[in-house]
Design a protein with these regions (language model features):
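Catalytic and substrate-binding clefts that recognize carbohydrates or anionic sugar/phosphate headgroups
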Residues: 1-194, 200-207, 214-219, 402
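N-terminal small/glycine-rich loop or linker at the start of catalytic domains
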Residues: 186-200, 303-316
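Composition- and surface-driven signal marking solvent-exposed, interaction-prone regions
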Residues: 140-143, 150-153, 211-214, 229, ...
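Aromatic- and carboxylate-enriched substrate-binding clefts and catalytic-loop regions
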Residues: 79, 86, 223-411
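Short, acidic/polar
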Residues: 206-219, 324-334
């Protein structure tokens, strides 16, 4: 993604009126923005109740101390302490490298269409930070944002819409603070014991090769808890290498009788893991089924939006459409994955929702839904597992995340 903005006008708003009501304290900012400030159990919330037409960006400055340290903004892979830098918040591939001045990143940008990474590129951004002054701040938005911690006297938080609310909560210790933060955002389900009981082998190539590696590992005294075959759905050969067949059911040529082989693994105390993502290749069986049901996001002209994933095209399952959400949950994850005994999978590609000419069922701009997509994708997986009675047994793991992912993603 290449994101640019043309700023027409940026106006500072000052407080012109304040009124205490039964609901809280109402703040009027020059008649352009109205906030309701409330406090409950030590948490302060500033909720936006009114905004003037035309306001489509939002900046907030929060007082800072020169010796303050700041952490968070989701999964930031280059820096633990965010102080002294700004962090654009947009779910994406991390890219190749973390520094635009290095040769490998420059070459990747030039030769691969801007695939080089920067220090802030992450699958899992989040408009939340934790301060060494023992408070956290969360902004209720899934729009593109940029949290800037470079000024010694204030933090400047930006988002490309007006957030629903801003929440601030403090605690005497970091342990207590994180307890409060996870109570608000949600807590990851506890992992099952089997993930700790040995090696989870990643193998590809079909039954003979993949299950053969398990046999050889056991023969050499290696404790094995799982076998992960991401090509359980088949392979697709492109000009630049082997890819997966994005049609999420077991491939009867590469993995014949896979359910029976999974049963045999289970008898040996070993789990089987696969791979699923929320896109379906347009020459696959599931795409044809989904097209009849109208589960795919559209273009402005009403046709299915197809994403070019490199010599093959895929439909975007529209999780804002309740029927599409239910279909993928029940007919793809449950029927073709859980029901054949699969114990886990990589739930990939939550960070890829396109933003150009994409029309979603709920009518919300994809620029707003893009950062929300990882949480919707996690929720789809979570509900499939929970409704199957396998929560606490099955593990699906994700790279992409955002606000709301925490309680829906097992790993």
């Amino acid at each position: 993604f290449k994101i640019e903005d043309h700023l027409i006008e940026r106006r500072p708003l000052t407080l012109t009126a304040a009124r205490v009501t039964e609901q809280g304290t109402e703040l009027d900012l020059e008649g352009q923005l109205k906030l309701l400030v409330t406090e409950k159990d030590g948490a302060v919330t500033l909720a936006v109740t009114e905004k003037a037409e035309g306001i489509n960006r939002f900046w907030l400055r929060v007082e800072a101390a020169e010796d303050e340290h700041v952490y968070g903004c989701g999964e930031q892979m280059s820096y633990f302490d965010l102080r002294g830098r700004h962090f654009p918040l947009w779910s994406s591939e991390p890219g190749v490298g973390r520094d635009k001045t290095t040769y490998v990143t420059w070459r990747s940008d030039v030769e691969n269409g801007g695939a080089g990474g920067d220090y802030y590129n992450t699958n899992y951004p989040e408009p939340t930070y934790v301060s060494s002054r023992h408070y956290y701040l969360h902004m209720d938005t899934t729009a593109y944002g940029d949290f800037d911690f470079r000024n010694p006297h204030y933090h400047e938080l930006q988002c490309w819409n007006v957030p629903g609310f801003i929440r601030i909560e403090a605690a005497p210790t970091f342990v207590e603070l994180l307890e409060k933060l996870t109570a608000f955002l949600g807590r990851q389900p506890e992992l099952p014991d089997w993930v700790y009981n040995g090696l989870i082998i990643g193998a590809q190539g079909g039954n003979e090769r993949s299950f053969g590696i398990v046999d050889k590992s056991l023969e050499h005294g290696i404790k094995v808890s799982g076998l992960w075959c991401q090509d359980w759905c088949g392979k697709r050969v492109t000009s630049f290498g082997k890819r997966l067949q994005w049609d999420w059911h077991y491939h009867k040529e590469m993995y014949p009788d896979l359910p029976k082989h999974i049963e045999e693994l289970h008898a040996r105390g070993i789990k089987f893991l696969g791979y699923v993502n929320p896109y379906l290749v347009n020459d696959g069986e599931l795409y044809a089924e989904g097209k009849k049901l109208g589960v795919f996001a559209k273009k402005a002209d009403g046709s299915d939006y197809l994403v070019d994933f490199g010599e093959f095209y895929c439909g975007v399952v529209d999780f804002t459409n309740p029927e599409a959400f239910r279909w993928f949950k029940d007919e793809v994850i449950k029927k073709y994955t859980l029901d054949i005994g699969i114990d886990g999978w990589m739930a990939d590609f939550g960070e890829y929702l396109p933003t150009d000419d994409l029309v979603l069922a709920n009518g919300v701009s994809p620029m707003i839904e893009h950062n929300h997509w990882p949480a919707l994708w996690a929720k789809c997986n979570y509900e499939a597992v929970k409704e199957s009675g396998k929560l606490g047994q099955v593990v699906y793991f994700m790279r992409a995340g955002g606000t709301g992912s925490q309680k829906y993603c097992t790993l």
